[in-house]
């Protein structure tokens, strides 16, 4: 398979609203999986907490981490608002996610980070 970048990524909804639960949790999970698949990004582990998302992913070298995250957060915002139009009123200006994200490359710590998700 060649070189891939394994990253631990954390990002949150705007205003850290505790929105990721129930029907929204399943829908947001489907959207994020679909968008990762479209870009050839493999999800090793993922955890949807009420106010943020953790993902352990392999990103192909043709994608930069920042361009992938821009795509993931931007496109998923549009898809979330299409599926759940009522959320537009809480978030305004079509941005579901807050600015920025946390990322750390995994390297030799992959097993320890995977254990965190379990």
Across the structure, where does each feature detected by a protein language model lie?
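Basic nucleic-acid-binding interfaces
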Residues: 1-118
């Amino acid at each position: 398979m060649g070189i891939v970048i394994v990253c631990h990524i954390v990002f949150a909804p705007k205003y850290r609203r505790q929105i990721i639960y129930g029907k929204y949790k399943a829908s947001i999970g489907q959207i994020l999986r679909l968008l990762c698949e479209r870009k050839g990004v493999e999800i090793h582990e993922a955890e949807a907490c009420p106010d943020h998302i953790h993902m352990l992913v392999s990103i192909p070298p043709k994608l930069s981490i920042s361009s992938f995250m821009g795509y993931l957060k931007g496109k998923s915002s549009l898809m979330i608002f299409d599926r759940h139009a009522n959320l537009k009123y809480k978030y305004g200006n079509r941005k579901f996610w807050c600015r920025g994200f946390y990322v750390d490359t995994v390297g030799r710590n992959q097993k320890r980070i995977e254990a965190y998700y379990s």
